[in-house]
Amino acid sequence: MKRTKKYPFLTLQRQRFHLNFENASSAAGIPAERDFYRWAWSALKNEYRRADISLILLDEEEARAYNRDYRGKDYATNVLSFALNEGEILPCQVSEKLYGDLIICPQVVLKEAAEQGKTPEQHFAHLTIHGTLHLMGYDHIEDDEAEIMEAEEIRLMRAAGFPNPYQED
């Protein structure tokens, strides 16, 4: 009996996870699309049976406009999360389907990675996981919420082969 290779995207399709990926950024040094799939799925797989997420990479000016228009902050940020079914479910509750949008600004991510002594891949992974957790209802406004979210980020980053994103060298 001939064995066939197992490809991650096939597993993702069976789990009904759809990531609509768009790179509208001019930045170089961005990880492959499949990496973003893998990182987002790692956060989702234990809590959602199905998900439909758009992940868009935008240059600083567009990311700044979204941050200004939706959060009232006039600067480009690393990641923005827009949960389309926000408030319908609780974190850690298995749901039928999650819908949401992630916007990542590669220029900000690359600058932060250099400043923090991280690899670009590590920082993109962290922010993809971080943003996906926000879509799932996690937050870090209150200290107790931040502890829960950061613990989950650390666990997922370690599972992906990366160090604790909050540990300084």
Swiss-Prot record:
The UniProt entry's GO biological process terms, in alphabetical order, are:
rRNA processing
Which Gene Ontology cellular-component terms appear in the entry?
cytoplasm
What is the predominant subcellular site recorded for this chain? cytoplasm
- Cofactor binding notes: Binds 1 zinc ion.
| SUPFAM superfamilies tied to this protein | Metalloproteases ('zincins'), catalytic domain
Q: Which InterPro entries does this UniProt record tie to the protein?
A: MetalPrtase_cat_dom_sf_prd (IPR023091), YbeY (IPR002036), YbeY_CS (IPR020549)
Q: Which residues form a coiled coil?
A: none
Q: What Enzyme Commission number(s) appear in the record? A: 3.1.-.-
Annotated GO molecular function terms are:
metalloendopeptidase activity; RNA endonuclease activity; zinc ion binding
User: Which residues are Zn(2+)-binding?
Assistant: 130, 134, 140
* Cofactor(s) the protein needs: Zn(2+)
Annotated keywords:
Cytoplasm, Endonuclease, Hydrolase, Metal-binding, Nuclease, Ribosome biogenesis, rRNA processing, Zinc
Where does the UniProt annotation locate this protein? Cytoplasm
What this chain does, per the entry, is described as: Single strand-specific metallo-endoribonuclease involved in late-stage 70S ribosome quality control and in maturation of the 3' terminus of the 16S rRNA.
* Family indicated by similarity: Belongs to the endoribonuclease YbeY family.
- Listed NCBIfam families: rRNA maturation RNase YbeY
Q: What is this protein called?
A: Endoribonuclease YbeY
Organism, scientific name: Neisseria meningitidis serogroup B (strain ATCC BAA-335 / MC58)
